[in-house]
């Protein structure tokens, strides 16, 4: 991820979350996207 892609992922966490995160619902997707960005 670049910094821009990271921000985009955080901004659309419900869509850009990892598969495992998405399986946990919106909150899981948010965490998945944020962890990937970091």
Curated annotation (Swiss-Prot):
Keywords: Antibiotic, Antimicrobial, Bacteriocin, Secreted
Coiled coil stretches, renumbered: none
Top-level lineage group: Bacteria
Biological process, per Gene Ontology: defense response to bacterium; killing of cells of another organism
Subcellular location: Secreted
Key word Secreted present: yes
GO cellular component, one term: extracellular region
SS bond partners: none
Function of the molecule: Bacteriocin active against Listeria monocytogenes, Pediococcus, Enterococcus, Lactobacilli and Bacilli.
Protein name: Bacteriocin curvaticin FS47
Organism for this UniProt entry: Latilactobacillus curvatus (Lactobacillus curvatus)
């Amino acid at each position: 991820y670049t910094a821009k892609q990271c921000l985009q992922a955080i901004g659309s966490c419900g869509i850009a979350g990892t598969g495992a995160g998405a399986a946990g619902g919106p909150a899981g997707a948010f965490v998945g996207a944020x962890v990937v960005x970091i």
